[in-house]
Amino acid sequence: IQSTSMDQGSLSEDSMNSFIRTFIQAGIWKNKVPKQAARTKDGTQTTAKKTEAEPEATANKDFQLGFQPVVSVDAELLRQQRRFSSPRVLLSENTPLEPPPLYLMEEPMVLNRTSRRKRFAEGKSHRGEYSVCDSESRWVTDKSSAVDIRGHQVTVLGEIRMGPS
């Protein structure tokens, strides 16, 4: 079942949110059922075997990369919510062939589309090569007055006392 266009007309934001909540809850419930079956009769959890721990390690690695495995969803749930369709969301019974591109997860600006993107210089390694004036950074210990960034004459303190005098 695939839904890629808004052929049913525009939907309110509340109805779309309720559909997404139902969709997520159904997926979460399906993932929790096998974990509950791993408990013994007296109510204590059994220790996981190595074969069961390996898929969890793979899932943790996928989670760290930002890729979450697709949760299987009943076709019945999709049929019930058929009136909800979106041009940005593809509902399908097939799993994706590959994880989402990593460049989308590396840049935090992609997640916040309302903020403007910061401009960078063409070649970062050439920054400052054609500067207007040269600057020197060194400690000056024998000055008693100086000019601040606004052009005002200021007194340079020889020592700064901190704490109670």
Curated annotation (Swiss-Prot):
Subcellular location: Secreted
Domain of life the protein comes from: Eukaryota
Chain segments carrying region Disordered: 32-61
Residue positions assigned to the propeptide: 4-119
Tagged with keyword Secreted: yes
InterPro entries given in the database record: Cystine-knot_cytokine (IPR029034), Nerve_growth_factor-like (IPR020408), Nerve_growth_factor-rel (IPR002072), NTF3_N (IPR045815)
MF terms in GO: growth factor activity; nerve growth factor receptor binding
GO terms (BP aspect): cell surface receptor protein tyrosine kinase signaling pathway; modulation of chemical synaptic transmission; negative regulation of neuron apoptotic process; nerve development; nerve growth factor signaling pathway; neuron projection morphogenesis
Gene Ontology CC annotation, any one: axon
PROSITE patterns in alphabetical order: NGF_2
Leader sequence residues: 1-3
Entry keywords, A to Z: Cleavage on pair of basic residues, Glycoprotein, Growth factor, Secreted, Signal
Glycosylation sites: N112
Family that this chain belongs to: Belongs to the NGF-beta family.
Known role: Seems to promote the survival of visceral and proprioceptive sensory neurons.
Protein name: Neurotrophin-3
Natural source organism: Xenopeltis unicolor (Sunbeam snake)
